[in-house]
């Protein structure tokens, strides 16, 4: 039906007759002449209708935005004065000879001339995706997946599919369950990741595996999370953690060079402990120059219990953030930052404004100045490298509260005061995570997942002191986003059972949930390691949006609903009966639909 795409026409096509298919993006009547901007997935081109071409001109007078059309015409160069440098096709236009209206459009529920609500955009997603910026994001996504497949193929990885209908295993989030019609009362689970299957593939001898795969997690959503998401899943045998990181870093560096024309350079490696200490986050945004500085040793003897209490507590922390030029902040702004960190459990935000260091205590403004002596103030200013015109913000509480609160405050200050370099890329690897963390109920939970191997420990040593264990795990972080995470896996049955026991999984539960894995570990399992990238998050970064829904064709809302198809919906009673399922509903919203299931 067509010979060319609209957005690919240029001066090399001048004089050629072309047939185009697409939509009317805009129509203009100029004193008896009709112009339209015609759009397809590749972009826009201007079309001119001459009154002398009566049939085409008459039809053109009927055109409205979003009519689907086909036209034939000749490409001609625009006069020098009419070249549009803002359009890729701005040097040419089409002189239309023939026009066909393929399909007319009703008045649109979305307004292209204003910002539409996200609810409207999701409800009419098929119209929203016609917008050039949305089309470009999905084209970039396709470019990324094609690039990844080529890279993985060139490096000897095999693309192997794993099951979508599988067994529920504890991986941190709730599973989406699928009832079995054949096996009454039993359920499949949609995979949260292909973790165990890719490990089994290593045990099968496939050596290098990858897959671009859908994963499902029934968890609370954020702007960068969806109930169904896509991973670039990777696993290798006989490769160490540094070797895995080397290949995956090469993939990402070459991807950024291909898509953005940016060389990311070598990725620095930072331990979890350093990241938390300096930045208050295990995914630090290194574009932001602010850092947390420990000062507990300097205020242990201060006559101010808010500081001295945590400073003398083994589980406490006192830290400061120096904000260059922050002495200009008003009391109202400072109070707002104090309220902000209350979200993270902080009880207040102490500060010191440094107006003129040469004046000592007389040169600062601070509600805690009366508790300081000259030597203590000087030590704090030296430790934080404070300069005249700066402000120091302090956190003093448990180590967790201070780290979380100041880590979040650091990011907010970076945004509010334009300290974060938005036009730069700062990747790194974060390594040496704790193997376990407290689960809030007196037990331990795996910080990554229960199949991660510890570093340099025997099963007996791990069982004796699990809290001290360091996981052989690694996360790739870019601009404060965790884009990928992985680890060396456990390839020893005794070690795997030890980890299960530490997590409170009984031997009976181990056999019921992981018997197939424990059996497989008996038969010459190779050492193996891997990683998974969040494809949606990678595309989000590479397209410059901060919302993952912008890079998924048909995403869900933060309530895990599809406004376009109205999923999820109540099931047909006959289907439920066939599955031998009775639905018990709770709450008014569910009660309103209960009759549909009875």
Curated annotation (Swiss-Prot):
GO terms for biological process: aspartyl-tRNA aminoacylation. ATP binds at residues 217-219, 226, 482, 534-537. One of its GO terms (molecular function) is ATP binding. It is an enzyme of class 6 (ligase). L-aspartate binds at residues 171, 217, 448, 489. It is found in: Cytoplasm. Its EC number is 6.1.1.12. One of its GO terms (cellular component) is cytoplasm. InterPro entries: Aa-tRNA-synt_II, aa-tRNA-synth_II, aa-tRNA-synth_II/BPL/LPL, Asp-tRNA-ligase_1, Asp-tRNA-ligase_1_N, Asp/Asn-tRNA-synth_IIb, AspRS_core, GAD-like_sf. The keyword Ligase applies. Keywords: Aminoacyl-tRNA synthetase, ATP-binding, Cytoplasm, Ligase, Nucleotide-binding, Protein biosynthesis. It comes from the Bacteria. Residues 195-198 are annotated as: Aspartate. It holds the Pfam family tRNA-synt_2. It catalyses: tRNA(Asp) + L-aspartate + ATP = L-aspartyl-tRNA(Asp) + AMP + diphosphate. Belongs to the class-II aminoacyl-tRNA synthetase family. Type 1 subfamily. Homodimer. Catalyzes the attachment of L-aspartate to tRNA(Asp) in a two-step reaction: L-aspartate is first activated by ATP to form Asp-AMP and then transferred to the acceptor end of tRNA(Asp). This is Aspartate--tRNA ligase. The gene is aspS.
């Amino acid at each position: 039906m067509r010979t060319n795409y609209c957005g690919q026409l240029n001066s090399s096509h001048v004089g050629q007759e072309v047939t185009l298919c697409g939509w009317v993006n805009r129509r203009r009547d100029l004193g008896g002449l009709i112009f339209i901007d015609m759009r397809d997935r590749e972009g826009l081109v201007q079309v001119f209708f001459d009154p002398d071409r009566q049939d085409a001109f008459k039809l053109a007078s009927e055109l409205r935005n979003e009519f689907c059309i086909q036209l034939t015409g000749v490409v001609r160069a625009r006069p020098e004065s009419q070249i549009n440098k803002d359009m890729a096709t701005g040097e040419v236009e089409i002189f239309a000879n023939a026009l066909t209206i393929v399909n007319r459009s009703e008045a649109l529920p979305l307004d292209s001339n204003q910002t539409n609500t996200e609810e409207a955009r999701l409800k009419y997603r098929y119209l929203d995706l016609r917008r050039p910026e949305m089309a470009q994001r999905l084209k970039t996504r396709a470019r990324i997946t094609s690039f990844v497949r080529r890279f993985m193929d060139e490096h000897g990885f095999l693309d192997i599919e794993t099951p979508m209908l599988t067994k529920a295993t504890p991986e941190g989030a709730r599973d989406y369950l699928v009832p079995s019609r054949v096996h009454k009362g039993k359920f499949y689970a949609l995979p949260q990741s292909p973790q165990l299957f890719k490990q089994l593939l290593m045990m099968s001898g496939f050596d290098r595996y990858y897959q671009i795969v859908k994963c499902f997690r029934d968890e609370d959503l954020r702007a960068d999370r969806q109930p169904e998401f896509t991973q670039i899943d990777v696993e290798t045998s006989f490769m160490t953690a540094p070797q895995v990181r080397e290949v995956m870093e090469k993939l990402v560096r070459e991807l950024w060079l291909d898509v953005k024309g940016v060389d990311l350079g070598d990725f620095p490696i930072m331990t979890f402990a350093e990241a938390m200490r300096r930045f208050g986050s295990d995914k630090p945004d290194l574009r932001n120059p602010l850092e947390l500085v420990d000062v507990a040793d300097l205020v242990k003897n201060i006559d101010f219990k808010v500081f001295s209490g945590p400073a003398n507590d083994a589980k406490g922390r006192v830290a400061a953030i120096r904000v260059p030029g922050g002495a200009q902040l008003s009391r109202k702004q400072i109070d707002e930052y104090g309220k902000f960190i209350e979200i993270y459990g902080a009880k207040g935000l102490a500060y010191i404004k440094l107006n003129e260091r040469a004046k000592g205590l007389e040169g600062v403004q601070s509600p805690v100045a009366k508790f300081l002596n000259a030597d203590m103030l000087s030590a704090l200013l030296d430790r934080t490298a404070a300069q005249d015109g700066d402000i120091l913000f302090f956190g003093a509480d448990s180590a967790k509260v201070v780290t979380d609160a100041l880590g979040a405050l650091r990011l907010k200050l970076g945004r509010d005061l334009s300290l974060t370099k938005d036009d730069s890329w700062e990747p790194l690897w974060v390594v040496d995570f704790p193997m376990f963390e407290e689960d809030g109920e007196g037990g331990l939970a795996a910080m990554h997942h229960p199949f991660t191997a510890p570093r340099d420990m025997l099963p007996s040593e791990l069982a004796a002191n699990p809290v001290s264990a360091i996981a052989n795990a690694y996360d790739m972080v870019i601009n404060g986003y965790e884009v990928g995470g992985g680890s060396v896996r456990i390839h020893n049955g005794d070690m795997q059972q030890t980890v299960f026991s530490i997590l409170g999984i009984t031997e009976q539960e181990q056999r019921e949930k992981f018997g197939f894995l424990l059996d497989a570990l008996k038969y010459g399992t190779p050492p193996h390691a891997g990683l998974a990238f969040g494809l949606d998050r990678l595309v989000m970064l590479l397209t410059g949006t901060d919302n993952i829904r912008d890079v998924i064709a048909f995403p869900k809302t933060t309530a895990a609903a599809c406004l376009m198809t109205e999923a999820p919906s109540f099931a047909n009673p006959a289907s439920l009966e066939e599955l031998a399922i009775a639905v018990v509903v709770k709450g008014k919203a569910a009660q309103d639909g209960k009759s549909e299931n009875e």
